[in-house]
């Protein structure tokens, strides 16, 4: 069974409209992702009527950021879109810092602006497309090598024993 990674979506209150706009613009691409969001963000996406299946964890204030960090450690989350309100200090700032630290430690990208999120979403789409093409390339290589070996064998047979 192949692992299907998850994309985490988090937005602070002042950034929720921007995330909703992004999700609406990229809805088709996001449909192909396993999505997880903090509670209020997930509820907002569900209420928006988008055709996205979004799992939720606790709100950020109640440990949701840490649950997503745990998902990174477990290898379940391989990308994070976090539209973070950097103008305010948050009571759970240590959790946010921990999420950023864990993501950096495990090499998981975090997109912190709508433009960066679009780049991430499109890169993930290309990665999925390449995975679909790879078996075809592998079959081509195997077939090419088999033909090469047959041609080499035929050439040696025509040359006769040394």
Where on the chain are the PLM-derived regions?
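General beta-strand structural signal in soluble alpha/beta enzymes
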Residues: 36-38, 56, 82, 110-114
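Short, glycine-/small-residue-rich phosphate/pyrophosphate-handling segment
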Residues: 115-150
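Short internal beta-strands
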Residues: 32-45
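Short hydrophobic/aromatic-enriched beta-strand-loop microsegments
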Residues: 34-35, 51-62, 131-135
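Short active-site oxyanion
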Residues: 7, 28-35, 107-108
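Mid-chain, well-packed structural core segment of small domains
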Residues: 65-103
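Histidine-anchored nucleotide/phosphate-binding helix
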Residues: 17-28
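Short, acidic/small-residue loops that bind anionic groups at enzyme active sites
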Residues: 100-120
């Amino acid at each position: 069974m192949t692992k299907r990674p998850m994309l985490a979506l988090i937005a602070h209150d002042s950034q929720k409209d921007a995330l909703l706009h992004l999700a609406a613009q990229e809805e088709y691409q996001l449909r192909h992702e396993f999505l997880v969001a903090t509670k209020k963000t997930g509820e907002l996406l569900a209420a928006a009527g988008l055709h996205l299946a979004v799992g939720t964890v606790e709100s950020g204030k109640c440990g949701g950021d840490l649950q997503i960090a745990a998902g990174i450690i477990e290898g379940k989350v391989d990308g994070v879109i976090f539209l973070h309100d950097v103008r305010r200090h948050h009571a759970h700032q240590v959790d946010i810092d921990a999420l950023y630290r864990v993501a950096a430690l495990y090499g998981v990208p975090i997109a912190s602006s709508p433009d960066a999120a679009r780049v991430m979403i499109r890169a993930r789409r290309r990665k999925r497309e390449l995975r679909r093409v790879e078996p075809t390339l592998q079959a081509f290589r195997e077939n090419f090598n088999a033909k090469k070996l047959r041609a080499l064998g035929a050439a040696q047979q025509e040359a006769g024993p040394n």
